[in-house]
Amino acid sequence: MLWGFDISHLDAHLDALLLRPEFFDVYLELAMEFALPLRLLSAEAEPNVGFPVRKLAADEGVLYADRFATLPAVGTRQAFIDLLHGLEPGVTELTLHPAIDTAELRAITTDWQARVSDHVLLVDDRGLDQVIEKAGITVIGYRTLRDAMRH
């Protein structure tokens, strides 16, 4: 892109650009101009916005995740395995917030225990690759969606 960054997707953190049609128009136009997928809210949450953001994006050929999944507050390995085995076909964005337990983390967020739990699961669990493979999951990122849009 302009400064040489290899941007994989656009993300309006906390769905800020999805709350008003005039903001979403700009978000969607950028996705179309640069052939970038969007991080959109789930189909279940879309009625809260008041206009069909997912359909508008799809009509323009802009890709996005089919659904979202996250672990409960403080997840366990078994909860993660259950979540993986319960995924439906399609593209699911798995949202985790791994963080190392520090005084700063504890000061800035009330969900620090869940973030530390996510970190332990992702970093310390050496068998996670096998669990993912056994569940029949192909791990991709938004770059894969971007490349599909560009070809």
Briefly describe each language-model feature range.
Residues 77-81, 88-91, 125, 129:
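Short amphipathic alpha-helical surface patches that serve as generic macromolecular interface elements
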Residues 37, 51-58, 83-104, 138-140:
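Aromatic-lined glycan-binding groove of carbohydrate-active enzymes
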Residues 49-55, 76-78, 102-111, 151:
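Histidine/acidic-residue-rich catalytic or RNA/ligand-binding cores of hydrolases
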Residues 1-63, 70-78, 85:
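Catalytic domains of cell-wall/extracellular-matrix polysaccharide-remodeling enzymes
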Residues 38-41, 109-151:
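C-terminal domain-boundary segment and adjacent tail
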Residues 10, 94, 132:
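Conserved, mostly hydrophobic/aromatic
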Residues 64-67, 118:
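Glycine-rich, flexible loop/turn motifs
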